[in-house]
Amino acid sequence: MSERTLRRPASLAEVAGRPLAGGTDLVPLLQDGLVEADALADVRELLPRGVEGSRIGAGTTLAELERSEEAPGALREACRLAASPQLRHMGTIGGNLLQATRCWYWRLAFPCFLHGGDRCHAREGEHREHAIFANDPCASAHPSDPAAALLACSATILTDRRRLALPELYRLPTDDDRSLTTLEDGELILEIELAPPDDSVYLKAMDRRRFSFPLVGVAAARYGDDVRLGLSGVAPIPWQLDSPEELDRATPLPGTAYKVEIARALVRRALEAVRA
């Protein structure tokens, strides 16, 4: 990582440079040259922190959410399964929602679609951990466990500029815009507001028993007779599943067909759990 300036602004109005909070995702990306920043702005002390009723400060760590009695069960479990204890104590919920893809072609700086190239190398190459929905022109899979839980819990994002429903935070990449979020330059997530469910659960399939990114993650949140589903690891962005039958319309690549069956099983188990 080349030398760069680290600023500690006294207020949000003074933030200039790339925002840095927990740094568990950003710092490795900077070290690997996958993102560029001449200056970093340490915003950790400026972000709201903690859980108050239905509002969560973006600076709240995953470890704090995991222990919070006010957070929905699905979110607590998603935070518990998201990373090692060290990373959970550093990583913030706001940063976790903005995680970069784990796609190895992108991480190895192949000239892939997300890097401005004309094709997705994973589609014709190794893609066992990639997407089963919306996987053309990019087959990357979003790695955030908490994002799936917040999607099921109908979360709303409050930034320093606007308010938007969680699905509006994300976008699928196009030829004109390869980014995966709708945040503008310098825009900061400040708080997350959710609708507390009657019951919720998060289930996850991963290669290792602990501290691995999701092959498939399924969150279910029940509101009366209605159950909302959010999935991780199945699309370039956190994926809202309108019904279990939507899995019939998945478009897996040859190496990801197994994910459809895992998703079916986890959705069935999640629905049974919140309806019990």
Where in the sequence are the language-model features?
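C-terminal structural segment of proteins
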Residues: 1-276
